[in-house]
């Protein structure tokens, strides 16, 4: 089967957003990959006012139910299974950075429910 890159690009240009969304989901399922953007490692530079409004959720210790914690990290971050596992295995590690207080507390509750120890910074 010949691979015609230009024909594929032309087809994608003509497709609707809904069709493209379905295509991305099908590719993710077929190849067991995730199209989600990776989590930022470095926080944005900001003043004291920005620091009070944003938090970093840090996984301190995964605990004994590591599989549940990996699944929770995968769901929270949108990472693939391997990336989520690497993040949990590398604890202490930042799960999400620059999030509002409500979202940070929600993430903390989910991870603690899975058995992890979490700190907000």
UniProtKB/Swiss-Prot annotation:
GO molecular function: mRNA binding; structural constituent of ribosome
UniProt keyword terms in alphabetical order: Ribonucleoprotein, Ribosomal protein
Single biological process term from Gene Ontology: translation
A Pfam family assignment: Ribosomal_L12
InterPro entries: Ribosomal_bL12, Ribosomal_bL12_C, Ribosomal_bL12_C/ClpS-like, Ribosomal_bL12_oligo, Ribosomal_bL12_oligo_N_sf
Presence of keyword Transmembrane helix: no
GO CC field: cytosolic large ribosomal subunit
Subunit and interaction comment: Homodimer. Part of the ribosomal stalk of the 50S ribosomal subunit. Forms a multimeric L10(L12)X complex, where L10 forms an elongated spine to which 2 to 4 L12 dimers bind in a sequential fashion. Binds GTP-bound translation factors.
Family statement drawn from the similarity comment of this UniProt entry: Belongs to the bacterial ribosomal protein bL12 family.
Function statement: Forms part of the ribosomal stalk which helps the ribosome interact with GTP-bound translation factors. Is thus essential for accurate translation.
Name of the molecule in the record: Large ribosomal subunit protein bL12
């Amino acid at each position: 089967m010949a691979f015609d890159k230009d024909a594929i690009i032309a087809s994608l240009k003509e497709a609707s957003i809904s069709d493209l969304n379905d295509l991305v989901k099908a590719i993710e399922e077929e190849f067991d990959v995730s199209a989600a953007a990776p989590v930022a490692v470095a926080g944005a530079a900001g003043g004291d006012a920005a620091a009070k409004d944003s938090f970093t959720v840090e996984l301190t210790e995964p605990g004994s139910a590591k599989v549940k914690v990996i699944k929770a990290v995968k769901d929270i971050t949108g990472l693939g299974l391997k990336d989520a596992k690497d993040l949990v295995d590398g604890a202490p590690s930042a799960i999400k950075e620059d999030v509002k207080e409500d979202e940070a507390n929600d993430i903390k509750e989910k991870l603690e429910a899975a058995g992890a120890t979490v700190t907000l910074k």
